[in-house]
Every structure is written in C-alpha cells, then in structure tokens.
Amino acid sequence: MRHALPSASVTDEIPGFPERFPVRDDGTRSWRYKAVSLLCRASLRGFFGRGLQLDSMSKFPAEGPLLVVCNHLSNIDPWIFGGFGPGALYCMSKRELFSNPVVSWILAGCNCFPVDRGAADRRALRTALDVLSRRGRLLIFLEGTRSSTPGMRRAEAGVGFLARRSGASILPVGVWGTEAALPRGHRLPRRVPIRLKLGPVFELPERLPGERRDDQAVADLIGSRIAELLPPAYRGVYAAVDTPAAIPSLR
C-alpha cells in the first residue's frame, strides 16, 4: 500500500526556518554546518578526551541514499554525529528546538528539520523522503526520543516506513555512556567513558520473520541490528529478539 504524503512546505511558520527546507544534491555543507561541526568536535574532544571512543567514520558510505539509525540516550548523541559524522548528514529534530528564530536558522543551516513528535508528521516524512530520493544521508533516532533508562525502547514505526518507502541502505549505530555523561534533567555534563559503534550497512531482506513486512516489523528489525552492537544492559526490549540469520550486506 502506498501512502499519500502532502507536498506542502516542511513546517508551518517557524520563525527563522525557511518556508521550504533546502535539500541539496551535491552533499556540501553550509558555513553554519561547518562552524557547528567544529564547535561540537572541539567541545567533545576537549571535555571527554580519550574517554570518547568512536568507531572509524570511514565505515560511513560516501554516498546515499542512507538511513543512519541510532539508539538515543542523551542530548549529547546528536552532538557526536554533528562533530564527527563525515560529509553532510540530515537530521530530524524535535519541533521544540525551533522555538527561537536564531536557533532555528542555525539548525536549518546544519541540515536539521523539525518533526512534531506528538503526531504523525507527514511533512517531516515528506522532507525525509526527499533527502533520501536525492541520495542524501539521513540520521534518525530509533525510539524517537531519549530513553528514560539505558535499555532500548521499542522502535518508532516511522523508521520502518522510511526504510520501506525509500529503499535506502541502513547503517545501524549503537551508542552508550552518554546517558551517564548528560542524564535527563541535567544541564552540565560529567566526564565518563562514551562509546559509539557502527554496524555493517545492510538492505532490507525480501522477507521478515513470520512473513511480516509492515512498518513496525521493519523498525523492529533495525532495532535488533542496533541491539547487537550494544552491551547486554543496553538492549532493552530487543534483548531477546531473534534477528534473521542473513541480511544482504553491502560491505
């Protein structure tokens, strides 16, 4: 079944945000993106030092379409991708972050676009599909919001929708330690070890367990691939999920 999505602008009258989000075809980064990336990288390395352990970003495919899907534990998580993610990444960000016109303008320059987490935001989905149709690389957090515990929450079905509809390759990413570095409700970070691990890029198989291939089943499959990258204490609802034995790998 094909889902009809509106072709309207990405958002309604957010001060500082362009009426139509500029999705670029050439993979270049704006000066705002470069400046924020440098700030993120310098801040994280300066504060956490060798405690910040990241897999080689050379595992990122140079071209899309690519869905980069990660579990979400802390507000530090997007900073890591902003500072160390190679090339240009696009990212869905909660609409509340765009309440300030200046912040909204900066986020737009960093390839971030708003999503309303309280509803099925079709405009955000349309923008995400536009990014992927132009062979872009889109970062999305699996659970849609920060987990209140280290263990993974169930994936949002929208992740499965984007994977199915776009046909993009998928890069699973696992992060842990950020929940201790900047817990929910805290304003100042703590110096603790942080680990980010990249999994192998894969494509959706033709069949899923039980013959299911709906949005939630696809999202759960991606969740199980992320869980494989995490220590057992962080796998949450995916601790006992059976993963298909073989998924066609692109790497």
Where in this protein do the model-derived segments appear?
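Non-catalytic C-terminal accessory region of glycerolipid acyltransferases
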Residues: 2-28, 123-251
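Catalytic core of membrane glycerolipid acyltransferases/transacylases, capturing the structured
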Residues: 62-119, 127
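A generic local structural motif
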Residues: 39-40, 51-57, 76-78, 125-127, ...
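Short, well-ordered coil/turn elements that cap or connect secondary structure elements
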Residues: 47-49, 86, 104-109, 165, ...
